Structure formats: structure tokens, C-alpha cells
Amino acid sequence: MKKFLLVAVVGLAGITFANEQLAKQKGCMACHDLKAKKVGPAYADVAKKYAGRKDAVDYLAGKIKKGGSGVWGSVPMPPQNVTDAEAKQLAQWILSIK
């Protein structure tokens, strides 16, 4: 049982790291930070705002793919060059940030 828990924790840490790496690779971190507002909102604030929303992953994945404006201030977020799977992966990761 202890080995299973260790493997599960290490596996989840790897997923979190991989998604942060994807965010860096795609340029997301140029405007966003995990905990502090930059040009765009902190990912922790995004996660808090959409916590409990049933369609949060799909909603955020759509915003990542298509861009958006007016939700977090006057600076629009341009559409991002990501696949549907990458957008969903990033959205799930963002929503996991505390």
C-alpha cells in the first residue's frame, strides 16, 4: 500500500510538472504566474474563480484556444497556438493550482 501511495504521489507530481512545462513551452508564463498577477491573472486566482463550475475545464480550454477579453481586465488574451488536447491539459492543470 505504501508503494502504491508513493507511486501515485510521484506520478501526480510528474503530471503537474509536465503541465507547467507545457505552459512554459507554449509561452503562457510570459503573461501568467502561478500565484502573482502579471499581464494576466495568476493561475491560482483563475482556479479559485472557476472552482466548482461543472464546465470549467471546457470553458477554460475554449478561452485558451480562442482567447478572450473583459473577464480579468482590459488586456485581452489572444488565441493560443495549442491543440484541443493541450488546451484541455492546460485547463485541468490551471484548475488544480491552489
Swiss-Prot record:
Heme c binds at residues 28, 31-32, 77. InterPro entries: Cyt_c-like_dom (IPR009056), Cyt_c-like_dom_sf (IPR036909), Cyt_c_ID (IPR002324). GO terms for molecular function: electron transfer activity; heme binding; iron ion binding. Binds 1 heme c group covalently per subunit. Residues 1-18 form the signal peptide. The keyword Transmembrane helix does not apply. PROSITE patterns: CYTC. The keyword Nucleus does not apply. Reacts with hydrogenase. Belongs to the cytochrome c family. This is Cytochrome c-552. It comes from Hydrogenobacter thermophilus (strain DSM 6534 / IAM 12695 / TK-6).
